[in-house]
C-alpha cells in the first residue's frame, strides 16, 4: 500500500503554535519553486500581537527588518486589520525560521497567534476545518505554476 501512495512534498511548514494553510504537492519542482527565495512567492498571514502595531513597525517591515542576529529580512508588508492594531496582516516574499515572530521581536512585540491565509495568491479554503484538506482546483494549480 505504501508504494501505491504518491510522494508528497511540503511547500513550506508551520511551527506547532501556528495554524493555517499548508500546501502539500506531488510535484517536487513546484514545491521547490514556491520555497525558493529567487521566486519571491507571496505568503499572507493574520497575526495577533500583544502590543499594537506602530508606525516604526510598519516602516521597519517596509524597509526590511534587521534581526537581533544581524540578518536583514527582505521588505515585507504589514497592515492593521483591527482598529486597535493588535490584529495585522503580514505579507512575506521570503521564508526564514520563525521570521514573523523574530521580526516583531525586534520591536519588542510578541506574537500571540499566527495563521497563514494564502500562498502564491491561493487562499486557504474557509470551508475547511483545522486538519481537513482538499485538492487544489485546476485554476489554483495554474496560478501556483505561474508564480515564477
Model-derived features: where do they sit?
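RNA pseudouridine synthases
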Residues: 1-148
